[in-house]
Amino acid sequence: MANPSPHQIYNVTWVITNVQTNTQANATSMLGTLTDAYPTLHVDLCDLVGDTWEPIVLNPTSVRPGAVLLSSSPKYGCKTTDRKKQQQTYPFYVCPGHAPSLGPKGTHCGGAQDGFCAAWGCETTGEAWWKPTSSWDYITVKRGSSPDNSCEGKCNPLVLQFTQKGRQASWDGPKMWGLRLYRTGYDPIALFTVSRQVSTITPPQAMGPNLVLPDQKPPSRQSQTGSKVATQRPQTNESAPRSVGPTTMGPKRIGTGDRLINLVQGTYLALNATDPNKTKDCWLCLVSRPPYYEGIAILGNYSNQTNPPPSCLSTPQHKLTISEVSGQGLCIGTVPKTHQALCNKTQQGHTGAHYLAAPNGTYWACNTGLTPCISMAVLNWTSDFCVLIELWPRVTYHQPEYVYTHFAKAVRFRREPISLTVALMLGGLTVGGIAA
């Protein structure tokens, strides 16, 4: 099975999970490609902590006489309003557990029981006076702003953002981090994972029998009796005709033969409307070997969208490589010298996460495949480039002498006949083609 286009749009959901309670702390969904669907994630610290930061508090009346009461109340946790408010004042730091080999050399960062922060230098992000940072970790975690000053609700917001390394990482499975409060004494630990769930917009086609095979029928013949029946007037002695209810019949499913004939007829109509002199005496032949389609480069006006429009959500059913494109049209990206002949006009694209939607009935032919939309994030981070095309069936145009030679015993001309595809003859004059 061919690899999907990197410009394909998916429904991407990012999930933050509290590891200690195995509960979902946050889920954020968006439409985008696997290259640009990296939103800013928001979660409250208490959703990562739950009840795990609630140390046992001794009742002073139950303390044995002579014992020293070190603390009458904890100053962190999520049980009470006071604890949540006090918790806002503590710095915190975050240590990765997904790649222990990438930590500082000679430093043992421990395991989950240490929050992966068994030694200083293991922390890669956080909100603390020493500004923990990293050049290789996948996320940054900072304190957000809370509109709830009373802390009756959630008032310890955290903001997670993906780094450049995180956008380039493989997210086939969840990745774990440990978060610790920086305080005198023991620094409490919260463990959380970040995972990505990807689903296609278009439901996948079920495997099974080829549905085209039962439709292998020859082209149907036109009925010759329809006009005769319509001109006959029934003989009757009745003074008024009887009303007969209309008979409704469902549309008849045409066979493969009719589909192929319709494809050639549509090509003929397009050619006849463009250059009727060429259709006076010719043969149009549908190519029976792949590639069955070809792309004709055209100039057109695409739309620039910040979010993928509905036209971007479909996956092209046709397959086309850049080598099957001819003509000259609009190119996007950095086009290598080997393909610059396809470009009548070249644009570098746009910065940021934009989607360039091809006009209705057209596609972008990229060196990574066919797509209705270009993700600028993919284009800017890869060596991909694209050409705006119309998609046409490969129907060849022949002079009548070329076909006659197949039935004659001897060749009736000396020079090699020239065969062209109809798409090349039209040169992309009809926006949208006939195969789109």
UniProtKB/Swiss-Prot annotation:
Residues 219-240 have a biased composition (Polar residues). The surface protein (SU) attaches the virus to the host cell by binding to its receptor. This interaction triggers the refolding of the transmembrane protein (TM) and is thought to activate its fusogenic potential by unmasking its fusion peptide. Fusion occurs at the host cell plasma membrane. The mature envelope protein (Env) consists of a trimer of SU-TM heterodimers attached by a labile interchain disulfide bond. This is Envelope glycoprotein. Residues 203-255 are annotated as: Disordered. It holds the Pfam family TLV_coat. PANTHER family: BC035947 PROTEIN-RELATED, VIRAL ENVELOPE PROTEIN. One of its GO terms (cellular component) is viral envelope. Residues 2-436 are extracellular. Keywords: Cleavage on pair of basic residues, Disulfide bond, Fusion of virus membrane with host cell membrane, Fusion of virus membrane with host membrane, Glycoprotein, Host cell membrane, Host membrane, Host-virus interaction, Membrane, Signal, Viral attachment to host cell, Viral envelope protein, Viral penetration into host cytoplasm, Virion, Virus entry into host cell. InterPro entries: FMuLV_rcpt-bd, TLV/ENV_coat_polyprotein. One of its GO terms (biological process) is virion attachment to host cell. Disulfide bonds join C95-C117, C109-C122. It comes from Feline leukemia virus (strain C/FS246). Glycans are attached at N11, N26, N237, N272, N277, N304, N344, N360, N380. Specific enzymatic cleavages in vivo yield mature proteins. Envelope glycoproteins are synthesized as an inactive precursor that is N-glycosylated and processed likely by host cell furin or by a furin-like protease in the Golgi to yield the mature SU and TM proteins. The cleavage site between SU and TM requires the minimal sequence [KR]-X-[KR]-R. A motif (CXXC) lies at residues 282-285. The record marks R415, E416 as: Cleavage. It comes from the Viruses. Residues 1 form the signal peptide. The keyword Amino-acid biosynthesis does not apply.
